[in-house]
C-alpha cells in the first residue's frame, strides 16, 4: 500500500498466506487433541467485510482481528477537523488543516454536523464533558460504530447470531490460487453439490 519503506511494502509475506498457515498448523494441533490457543489475525484489515473474512478464515481458532493503520485514520482526520475549526488547538491535537476541505464541508461546519456519532458519544460522556473530548476520539468511535453495524449486517446475511458461529464455509475464494493456498472453496465450487442435488431431484 502506502508504506514508507520496502520492508513494509514488499519484503514481507502476504497476510493471507500467514493466516492460512496459522489455521493449517492450529488444525494439526487440534487433530492431535491438543488445546489451540486463541489466535488473532492482523495485516491489512480496515473494514467490516475484511473482519468477517478474517474471523471465518481462521475459524474456529481466530477470536480477534487486529487493526492498525485502518483504525488510526479516523483519529487523524478528526484531529485535522478539530485543528481546522479551532486554530488555537491545532498544535495540541496535531492537526494539519488550516480549513475544512469541501468534502467535509458538504456534511457541515460543526462537530455536531460532521460526526455521525457525535450525539452517541454525548450520551455516554454527558453534554458538559463533550468540550473535553478530542474530535479524533469522536471519529474513532464513529468508525467503531460503522464496523459494528456492518458486521451485524454481514452476520445477518450469513444467518449467524455471533462472530463465534462463523466457519470457513461462510466464505469462498475468488480465485483458484487463493483456494489452493487457503483450503477455502472456490466460488464456483461453493454450494455446487447442493445445487446439483436440487437440479437432479
Regions found by a protein language model. Give the residues of each.
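C-terminal extensions of enzymes
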Residues: 73, 104-201
